[in-house]
UniProtKB/Swiss-Prot annotation:
MF (Gene Ontology): structural molecule activity
Organism: Potato virus M (strain Russian)
Primary role: Required for genome encapsidation. Forms ribonucleoprotein complexes along with TGB1 helicase and viral RNA.
Keyword Nucleus on entry: no
Intrachain disulfide bonds: none
Region (Disordered): 1-54
Keyword Ribonucleoprotein: yes
Name used for this protein in its record: Capsid protein
Subcellular location: Virion
Other known facts: The N- and the C-terminus of this capsid protein may be exposed on the surface of the virus particle. The central core sequence may be important in maintaining correct tertiary structure of the capsid protein and/or play a role in interacting with the viral RNA.
Pfam annotation, one family: Flexi_CP
Length: 304
């Protein structure tokens, strides 16, 4: 009886279990299609993101290459102007109140160089000359032209304080005597030669432009190759304190021209200074005669 009861219960459980299995709905095709659609959507989104990333990288590469392309390539860069200023350490900072302060190269670079020569007319001298020439009737816009004409005149004649000029300097619809102009230059610049030195580079370029060396170059003993060196202020052509031509010097003086000029200057100075041996020019000292000729033996310069 017990066995039959167990069999009946077992059969009942199996029947109930079968009913439950029969009651569970079976998966349909739509269930599988939805799962595939979700997976496909995620895959397509990942592919799209990858494509967009590649496009962005290509765009960045394109812009990078565009920035680097061009017909200009700067080589041998050595830029100093506009560089970032250095920040010195606390214990290296300068003390401008101490006379023994050691200035750095950075500090020295901020002090602009100013070329100055005491042997030529200053800006104040030239302003006096300009104002006085205006007062004599020279139009303001033609004052520099007159001054340059005077300097070129001295290139041919002389820049000596004993120069007695002839002629006149002209401008459109006007002229002024050379005596008047050179008198102003001598008075306001102390000597005429100081003004001529100031315009020596301008004189040099003018001679080369017109192939017009000093008129007396042959009489002064210069050779043809050195003729452009035959004026008083030749040794100031390369002086940076002088008035510079707009484009710069056409060419620099040659060593041969410098030798020729210095040789002639030495001879001329010794000839002019022969009376400097006297402490007084009174007749009791000079005897009414010029001093002895100052000579120099140039032959020894070639001996070894």
């Amino acid at each position: 009886m017990g066995d039959s009861t167990k069999k009946a219960e077992t059969a009942k459980d199996e029947g109930t279990s079968q009913e439950r299995r029969e009651a569970r709905p079976l998966p349909t095709a739509a269930d599988f299609e939805g799962k595939d659609t979700s997976e496909n959507t995620d895959g397509r989104a990942a592919d799209a993101d990858g494509e967009m990333s590649l496009e962005r990288r290509l765009d960045s590469l394109r812009e990078f290459l565009r920035e680097r392309r061009g017909a200009i390539r700067v080589t041998n860069p050595g830029l100093e102007t506009g560089r970032p200023r250095l920040q010195l350490a606390e214990n290296m900072r300068p003390d401008p109140t101490n006379p023994y302060n050691r200035p750095s190269i950075e500090a020295l670079s901020r002090i602009k160089p100013i070329a100055i020569s005491n042997n030529m007319a200053t800006s104040e001298d030239m302003m006096r000359i300009y104002v006085n020439l205006e007062g004599l009737g020279v139009p303001t816009e033609h004052v520099q032209q007159v001054v340059i004409q005077a300097v070129l005149f001295c290139k041919d004649a002389s820049s000596s304080v004993f120069l007695d000029p002839r002629g006149s300097f002209e401008w459109p619809r006007g002229a002024i005597t050379a005596d008047a102009v050179l008198a102003v230059l001598k008075k306001d610049a102390e000597t005429l030669r100081r003004v001529c030195r100031l315009y020596a580079p301008v004189t040099w370029n003018h001679m080369l432009t017109h192939n017009a060396p000093p008129a007396d170059w042959a009489a002064m003993g210069f050779q043809y190759e050195d003729r452009f060196a035959a004026f008083d202020c030749f040794d100031y052509v390369e002086n940076t304190a002088a008035v510079q031509p707009l484009e710069g010097l056409i060419r620099r003086p040659t060593p041969r021209e410098k030798v020729a000029h210095n040789t002639h200057k030495d001879i001329a100075v010794r000839g002019a200074n022969r009376n400097q041996v006297f402490s007084s020019l009174n007749a009791e000292v000079t005897g009414g005669m010029n001093g002895p000729e100052l000579t120099r033996d140039y032959v020894k310069s070639n001996r070894k």
